[in-house]
């Protein structure tokens, strides 16, 4: 009888140790994400998380369609795991507040572009230079008015868009 009781206690003890071990191991595997705006770790779409603007992605209109209806387009090439792109997303979101109805905003994650792809000039991939963030402004006639890599200021892009729309210069 004592032998049966001893075996039963050992079995319960082993099951308890196994259950605790699985619990501790699963807690270690599911620790919260450590990504933030100042690092290059992926934690979701930059426009949704850092700009607070999920309406930018996915783009509502293609570049080809925007040019067909003679609407200027602002193309932004980005990746979700770049601190520069995370910080820059707020600038693009602010611009959309002012120009969202007059211009097409086309954010393009470079992960979606084909490597060595041949693109027509009506496809955003045609303008990609290989670095992010990259901002391209194409006017209603398809002419490139701005094509720069890096984080641009709101004012720089605003100045270009004011020229595209023939608006008065911004007052400082």
Please provide the spans of the model-predicted regions.
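Short active-site neighborhood of thiol/selenol oxidoreductases, capturing the structured segment around
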Residues: 66-81
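Extracellular/periplasmic catalytic domains that process cell-envelope and extracellular macromolecules
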Residues: 67-69, 100, 127-131
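Thioredoxin-like thiol-disulfide oxidoreductase module
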Residues: 93, 104-133, 137-141, 154, ...
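Bacterial N-terminal signal peptides
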Residues: 15-28
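Typically the conserved alpha-helix immediately C-terminal to a functionally engaged Cys/Sec
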Residues: 61, 84-99
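N-terminal secretory signal peptides that target proteins for export/translocation
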Residues: 1-11
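N-terminal "domain-start" segment that seeds a small globular fold
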Residues: 30-62
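Thiol-/selenol-based redox modules, centered on thioredoxin-like
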Residues: 147-172
